Each structure stands twice: as structure tokens, then as C-alpha cells.
Amino acid sequence: MSNPCGAVHQPLRRTILPSTKEMILLTNPETGYEKAHQQVEQIFREVFPARGMAVREGQIRLCHTMLDALFGRDVALCDAGVGLGKTYAYLVACVLWQLQKPRPMQRPVVISTASITLQNAILEEYIPFLSKVLIQNGYIQDPICAVLRKGKERFVCDVRL
């Protein structure tokens, strides 16, 4: 089955993930972990405010926490109030994390939401805006590719998760 991004989707399967030490070795040594965290600061303190967005310390901390979890192959359970900017925090973390991996190592990031409204907003507002801003500021060259997967076979099962 193909999608608009041109990738072929295979059924989910369990794989053995590299350890944190191995993961750090797989990252691009020129840009790596530290640069990704520096880019979080630049994006949220300079790039977004230049577009009229407010600097939110909680949003920046949340993005750093999520980036740490992604680099460490850990789980981050984060709770944040309405209006903090959670969506941009996790989208920026995911984009920066993917940028640190060589192309063959990049895999899709799965985001599960509680509402159809948020799904639509991510696809129609957040990702197009983020793509445009990150391209204009030299962080990425191509637009962020996203696909919405619907249907009962796509639901996250609490028991199997």
C-alpha cells in the first residue's frame, strides 16, 4: 500500500532497538544530540517569535524532554495544560530527532491523538506551518511528510501497547 509521501507501509512488527550508546553512535556526529537541543532553543526563542508566537518556557522544557526521550529510546509521560503548545513541542522534537539520523535509519514517527479535530489540525495547520518555517530558516530542505491513517485496524490497543 503506498501513500502520498511515496513510502510503502508494512505491518508493524517488533524489532530489537539499539541501546542508547549505539543510538548515539548512529547519529550524525556533526549535528547530534547537542545541536538538536540548541536548535530547540533557536526555534522556540527566535524563529517562532519572529512569526508572532510567544516564548513559552514550559513548551521549550517539554520539547527538550521529548527530544531526550527520543534520543534515549525512552518513554516520556508528559502532562501539560491547555495552551502550553504541546503539539509544536512534540512535532519539533520529532523533526529534529529525525534530522540527526542518516537517511537509511529514518523511520516514520507515529503520533496518536485523542480527537479527530487535533488530527486534522496537525495535518492542515501545524505541519504546513512548521514545514514552511523550518524550510525558510534552513533547518529542512523538503516539506514534512505526514499521512493520516484511519480505521478500526489502526487504533492503538491499550493491552498490546
How would you label these PLM feature ranges?
Residues G72-V92:
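Walker A/P-loop
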